[in-house]
Amino acid sequence: MLPRHSCSLLLFLLLLPSVPMEPQPPSSTLPPFLAPEWDLLSPRVALSRGTPAGPPLLFLLEAGAYGEPAGAPANRSRRGVSETAPASRRGELAVCDAVSGWVTDRRTAVDLRGREVEVLGEVPAAGGSPLRQYFFETRCKAESAGEGGPGVGGGGCRGVDRRHWLSECKAKQSYVRALTADSQGRVGWRWIRIDTACVCTLLSRTGRA
């Protein structure tokens, strides 16, 4: 014999109206952009529905501190380009010339584990059209026809004594956060390498650094 309160509970449950379960919408194949991820974004990465009009604020502040003016766009895949220029002090020159701009057509990159991944063109956004990923990269200025000499990519560094040193201007890379897919199609936020500076590398001609 069941206790009286158990019988009452059983009768109550049997008399409850059945509640229809609404079908759950299929989950998106792309992971949502969670709020904590914003803290991991680099100023060199922009998530926007259109190409950014100018360099990141942090870059502008640094450029202003060193007296570097902004230039004109170089091509369709690099917007808001600026080139390093001589500082305001007379006689000062950069060891290596660099050019910076938004890369709008990046398709692949190398992740933190050294694997090539696909950089997704769109990032899902709640309540609106997806966002696109843009990367503000800094590279060594390419040597132009008739403008050879030190300070350009692949060339020697400006102001280095060639009798004692071998020098070369090379791009330096840093890691930034981006939405990517690996070779198995797994989508996720990963750290990828992009060009962020043009630096001078030195090698002693005598074999000693």
Curated annotation (Swiss-Prot):
Q: Which InterPro entries match?
A: Cystine-knot_cytokine, Nerve_growth_factor-like, Nerve_growth_factor-rel, Nerve_growth_factor_CS, Neurotrophin-4
Question: Tissue range of expression?
Answer: Expressed in thymus, muscle, ovary, brain, heart, stomach and kidney. Expressed in both embryo and adult tissues.
Cross-referenced Pfam families, in alphabetical order?
A: NGF
Q: Where in the cell is it found?
A: Secreted
Query: Which pairs of Cys residues are joined through disulfide bonds in the record?
Result: C96-C169, C140-C198, C157-C200
SMART domains named among the record's database cross-references? NGF (SM00140)
Q: Which one of the record's GO molecular function terms can you name?
A: growth factor activity
- The keyword Membrane is assigned to this record: no
Q: Where is the signal peptide?
A: 1-21
Q: Glycosylation: which residues?
A: N75
Keywords assigned by UniProt, alphabetized: Cleavage on pair of basic residues, Disulfide bond, Glycoprotein, Growth factor, Secreted, Signal
Cited PROSITE patterns: NGF_1, NGF_2
Q: Which family does it belong to?
A: Belongs to the NGF-beta family.
Q: What is this protein called?
A: Neurotrophin-4
